[in-house]
């Protein structure tokens, strides 16, 4: 049988561990599900709606195979989009998407057919029949997957109206926001001044300097906490270097708000300092700091201009600068202490140095 019950389980101990863990509830503390879709209990009626309309990992596979963008993010027919995906997938054995897709086909549709052009029609038809009754909706899928909590990814300026509405419902799971601070720290981005203005408006703070920025961040963080948030998440290419005092960060922020150029040293100093202050805010609130390190966003400008963000145009960055990581963690630890911290790296070559580094900060007083 293709993708049988023991796929990936290579010995008896693996089976024993899986049997022990398979029925445990899932706490998904980092995902990109849209809270609006959960609130509206969005119904998925075919595999393209369920799999392809928002999964940029699958889009990368299709682009690599040469599929026209019309059948990836464009206005192509849903069935034809799935057929193009089924044509591409067999060429990517070893890619996690290959395994994910077949595991999902088995778990949710009880189908063990290989996804390929030969089986595309049967897979499409049989899944279509199973989805026709509306049972493949956002809430039913979450509940049916034994998920107890979903933590979404939300910008500090978001109003969290969907989260508040979901919280008023009687669901067997929680949907909590997470304070995603990328746009706060990315001072070099062209729209940063506009973003800071928006942040000030929603926080009720006129941001003219670094202290006002910190006040706005703190107000928005408290707003998130009031709506169930327990964590902040920051994605970055690498750890910044060099703490700056408030006056230095004032000058850097003032230049940026005036649309002036800032160099890499200014950027790093500003990011380091802002992140250190955010870390203290988190510790004071008993929150978790999540750091996603090692990603370069929107590498393909033409693709970004056509399709926007999170469409499959991101890449793995160079090896982690462990010295910078050490300096940041050590500075925060010496100045009030680290909050609970999770560090992810997208570059597998960085796992070993990062694992040894975080071991240096385990067991500190909390």
Predicted regions: what they are:
Residues 288:
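Residue-level detector of anion-binding/catalytic polar loops
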Residues 314-326, 346-354:
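A general structural motif
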Residues 304-316:
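Active-site loop ensemble at the mouth of alpha/beta enzyme cores that anchors a bound cofactor
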């Amino acid at each position: 049988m293709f993708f049988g019950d023991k796929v990936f389980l290579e010995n008896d101990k693996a089976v024993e561990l899986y049997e022990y863990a398979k029925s445990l509830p899932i706490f998904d503390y980092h995902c990109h599900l849209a809270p609006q879709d959960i609130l509206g209990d969005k119904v998925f009626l075919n595999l393209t709606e369920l799999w392809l309309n928002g999964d940029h990992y699958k889009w990368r596979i299709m682009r690599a195979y040469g599929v026209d963008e019309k059948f990836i993010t464009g206005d192509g027919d849903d069935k034809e989009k799935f057929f193009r995906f089924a044509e591409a997938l067999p060429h990517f054995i070893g890619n996690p998407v290959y395994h994910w897709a077949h595991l999902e086909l088995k778990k949710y549709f009880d189908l063990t057919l290989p996804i390929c052009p030969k089986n595309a029609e049967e897979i499409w038809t049989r899944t279509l029949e199973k989805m026709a009754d509306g049972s493949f909706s956002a809430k039913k899928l979450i509940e049916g997957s034994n998920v107890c909590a979903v933590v979404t990814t939300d910008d500090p300026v978001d109003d969290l109206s969907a989260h508040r509405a979901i919280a008023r419902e009687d669901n067997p799971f929680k949907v909590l926001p997470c304070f995603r601070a990328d746009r706060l720290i990315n001072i070099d981005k062209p729209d940063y001044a506009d973003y800071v203005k928006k942040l000030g408006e929603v926080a009720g703070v006129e941001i003219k300097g670094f202290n006002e920025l910190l006040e706005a961040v703190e107000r928005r963080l408290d707003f998130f906490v009031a709506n169930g948030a327990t964590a902040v998440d920051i994605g970055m290419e690498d750890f910044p270097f060099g703490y700056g005092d408030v006056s230095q960060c004032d000058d850097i922020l003032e230049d940026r708000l005036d649309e002036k150029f800032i160099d890499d040293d200014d950027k790093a100093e500003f990011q380091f300092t802002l992140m250190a202050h955010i870390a203290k805010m988190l510790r004071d609130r008993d929150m978790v700091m999540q750091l996603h390190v090692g990603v370069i966003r929107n590498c393909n400008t033409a693709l970004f201009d056509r399709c926007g963000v999170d469409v499959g145009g991101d890449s793995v960055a160079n090896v982690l600068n462990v010295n910078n990581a050490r300096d940041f963690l050590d500075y925060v630890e010496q100045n009030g202490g680290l909050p609970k911290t999770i560090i992810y790296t997208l570059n597998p070559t960085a796992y070993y140095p990062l694992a040894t580094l975080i071991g240096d900060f385990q067991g500190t007083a909390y």
